Amino acid sequence: MDSLEARLQFIQVLKNLQKTLHKTRDSITSSSTTTPPSSQQKLNNDPIQFYLRNYRHHYEDFHQCLFDTTMKMDPLDRLDVVIYYVRIIRNLYPHSHSNTNVTKVLNEVLLMDIDLVFELCLPCQDWKSLTNQATCKELFLDLSKLIHYDATSVTHTPSDTTLIDATTWYSVKTERTTKDYKESLQRTESLLKDRDLKKLAFFQQFNSDTTAINPDLQTQPTNANILLHRMEADRELHKRSKETSWYIERPSNDILDESEFKSLWTHFETTDSGFDKDDYKNIKALNDIAKASYIY
């Protein structure tokens, strides 16, 4: 796949994130077992797997394409891109300690521009984009926990009595004087704290006794199709989270982790003398129930 083809395919991946971005955690290492055809089809359509399969040769193309394509979206539609971006980092980070190529892509590309990605979702002077604030905070805190970055200040909720300047919006672009991913994380932290204050300022006007609305806090009308698209995206995200709430993260795609199996095996060896007749009867009963469920 050449550079042009990679860009074209990645644009389609970004445009279809609402339909294809599942709430799963895919490992960069494949299982030793054979993947069933149905599962293979899902992996082929998975946007995270697409990135993991092709990023070694095209990560620069993908990165530039992500910003160019996302800039053309409405801010309400950009949340899926941030979710996608963070999940890519989550999949790559466990391998960064043993693979220098992964470390380079993470530290010099993905984490380096994490602040710009979040600002795409929370742009300056766009009040409706504050709808993305809560999810962005969750994503950043989740990412900070993964890479061991202290982001406790983001969890602090500003007081209702705080005096807020609604006219000045923090922008990470004016602060990008050095190239260091740790400073990029700090700028993202500052961005989220500023947007928390802007969100508070927006709601404070409805709690005040003044009848006049501050012109700096007025929002522009939003296209109905954009609102409906965002509502559908939120519904789909909620649906996916419910469908996979039972999911247990494994170090690999194997059914049972080796350490987990040993722990269970040792537990039964030390607390139970072994199987008795009742155990075998229970197993037979469960087997009969399982067979009966496949009669048709």
Swiss-Prot record:
Highest taxon of source: Eukaryota
Keyword Phosphoprotein found: yes
One of the record's GO cellular component terms: carboxy-terminal domain protein kinase complex
PTM remark: Ubiquitinated. Ubiquitination leads to degradation by the 26S proteasome pathway.
Record InterPro entries: Ctk3 (IPR042326), Ctk3_C (IPR024637)
Record's compositionally biased regions (Low complexity): 29-39
Modification Phosphothreonine occurs at: T35
Keyword Iron: no
Single Gene Ontology MF annotation: cyclin-dependent protein serine/threonine kinase regulator activity
Renumbered residue ranges of the record's region Disordered: 25-44
Localisation: Nucleus, Nucleolus; Cytoplasm
One GO term of the biological process aspect: positive regulation of transcription by RNA polymerase II
Gene disruption: observed consequences: Null mutants are viable, but grow more slowly than wild-type cells at 30 degrees Celsius. They are cold-sensitive, failing to grow at 12 degrees Celsius. They display flocculent growth in liquid media and they show abnormal cell morphologies, for example, a significant fraction of the cells are greatly enlarged. Deletion mutant is sensitive to the DNA synthesis inhibitor hydroxyurea (HU) and UV irradiation.
Pfam families associated with the record: CTK3_C (PF12350)
Sorted UniProt keywords: Cytoplasm, DNA damage, mRNA processing, Nucleus, Phosphoprotein, Transcription, Ubl conjugation
Binding partners and assembly: CTDK-I consists of three subunits, CTK1, CTK2 and CTK3 (also called alpha, beta and gamma). Interacts with CTK1. Heterodimerization with CTK2 is required to protect this subunit from degradation.
Protein family: Belongs to the CTK3 family.
General function of this protein: Gamma subunit of the CTDK-I complex, which hyperphosphorylates the C-terminal heptapeptide repeat domain (CTD) of the largest RNA polymerase II subunit. CTDK-I phosphorylates 'Ser-5' if the CTD substrate is not phosphorylated at 'Ser-5', but will phosphorylate 'Ser-2' of a CTD substrate if 'Ser-5' is already phosphorylated. CTDK-I is also more reactive toward substrates that are prephosphorylated at 'Ser-2' or 'Ser-5' compared with an unphosphorylated CTD substrate, therefore efficiently creating doubly phosphorylated CTD repeats.
PANTHER family found in the cross-reference section: CTD KINASE SUBUNIT GAMMA (PTHR28291:SF1)
More info: Present with 2640 molecules/cell in log phase SD medium.
Name of the protein this chain belongs to: CTD kinase subunit gamma
UniProt organism field: Saccharomyces cerevisiae (strain ATCC 204508 / S288c)
Lineage: Eukaryota, Fungi, Dikarya, Ascomycota, Saccharomycotina
Gene assigned in the entry: CTK3
